[in-house]
Amino acid sequence: MLAYPTTSSPWPPRHHGAAAAPAARRHMAAAAARGKRRGAGAAAAEGADEAAEAADLVRFFLRRTSGGKERLVAVLDRHVKVVRTEHCFLLFEELGRRDGWLQCLEVFRWMQKQRWYVADNGIYSKLISVMGRKGQIRMAMWLFSQMRNSGCRPDTSVYNSLIGTHLHSRDKSKALAKALGYFEKMKTIDRCQPNIVTYNILLRAFAQAGDTKQLDILFKDLDESPVSPDIYTYNGVMDAYGKNGMITEMESVLVRMKSNQCRPDVITFNILIDSYGRKQAFDKMEQVFKSLLRSKEKPTHPTFNSMITNYGKARLREKAECVLDKMTEMGFKPNYVTQECLIMMYAYCDCVSRARQIFDELVSSQNNVHLSSVNAMLDAYCMNGLPMEADQLLDSVIKKGAVPSASTYKLLYKAYTKANDKKLIQKLLKRMNSQGIVPNKKFFLDALEAFGNTDKKPRTVPSKNSASKPDVESANNSGTDTSSKPNLSVWQVAA
């Protein structure tokens, strides 16, 4: 089977200003230069060069088709001499991120007409995965049947894609049943034996569904199989439980993790910090943070961002600001996500003017402000009952070239509906119409829910252990846990 670039690998830096002919000529010239290379390290350099050139060419193709300038197939036809399987694979990845599943099918049809095309499991697996993420279950199943008709024999990666596809469907109980059906079928085929990716997909899915019984069955099956769990296994399950607020179940996975001699990484610490923060178990959250600082792992931006967000939701402004101080003290420069977290924190704490000050600083420090930052400030106004200010901000950012998304309009529509401001609602709908955004049923149902919510914003009651100053300032010092849970702390797992 052909080897393809991993989906998690970052693309090389962009090259701007490339014209069509020069881009193709550069690709062919580089190929000729690679043929002349000799000496140690030539193979590694060649592989890196090939990946960079392929990514560069794919970006060029997508630039040519952006905004409906040209059809992608027409662009591929003009460069047919240099396009190969690896370029199409990269196109599938990028089009999948851009909701371009129909274009993926067009590229696939184009591929099949080329002399160099050979039916391959990797291509079908990628396409099935893309269709699944976009909810195109029938199309994914059609591709699976096409793969078998083309002479390809399904392997583990194809079945993993099928399982992931069904888990994206709306009927979760039916999806889980189908996923288990494929899992059992895989066990009966030698070339399709479940691997750790298969188990990780299923374990996370059942954790998200809160099905602890099936989760225990899968863990037992994993223990009896030749496959060994990895850090992704435990992190995936703990994250799913944590996001569902199932803290006891999350802690039981932590115990299982230690019993299998698997050391936590920074992702593990971040999951625990966020999960305890969501439940406002701040004593445990701070204990995990101290354990992180004592371990070989180092905090990351998400570590601090999560703490700021969760303290903010509990309206603990001083604690959130102490986290920011600790972050700066440790040499971390707040990124735009941190600033968005601060905007929301101050919004929860009734400090809209301070939130706007941070937003203005963010705008002045960046050439292109992320739409998520705009949405954060709009949300800050809306949750504090300031729809007029939100509308004025929207006017301002649109004049500067920002293009609101459906999520932007959704949060504003809910706020304007809650405020019963018909004038702003009409203005917003006209904007949506001019931008070609058509609201669906869910859009209006979510807005109707706003009528039932009479509070200005969620008022959460801090836990009794969270009234004091945060422990982040003294996190480097040893401390004892006064709470009864968890029975096993992260620093004990890491020991």
Swiss-Prot record:
Record Gene3D superfamilies: Tetratricopeptide repeat domain (1.25.40.10)
Entry annotated with the keyword Plastid: yes
The protein, known as: Pentatricopeptide repeat-containing protein PPR5 homolog, chloroplastic
Source organism per UniProt: Oryza sativa subsp. japonica
Chief place of localization: plastid
Residue stretches in coiled coil: none
Superkingdom to which the source organism belongs: Eukaryota
Stretches forming PPR repeats: 120-154, 155-189, 195-229, 230-264, 265-299, 300-334, 335-365, 370-404, 405-439
Functional summary from the UniProt entry: Involved in the biogenesis of the plastid translation machinery by promoting the splicing of group II introns in chloroplasts.
Keywords: Chloroplast, mRNA processing, mRNA splicing, Plastid, Repeat, Transit peptide, Translation regulation
Transit peptide limits: 1-29
GO molecular function, one term: mRNA binding
One GO biological process term: regulation of translation
Disulfide bonds listed in the record: none
Disordered as annotated region, ranges: 1-24, 455-495
Pfam families given in the database record: PPR, PPR_2, PPR_3
Family per similarity comment: Belongs to the PPR family. P subfamily.
Record flagged with keyword Transit peptide: yes
SUPFAM superfamilies: TPR-like (SSF48452)
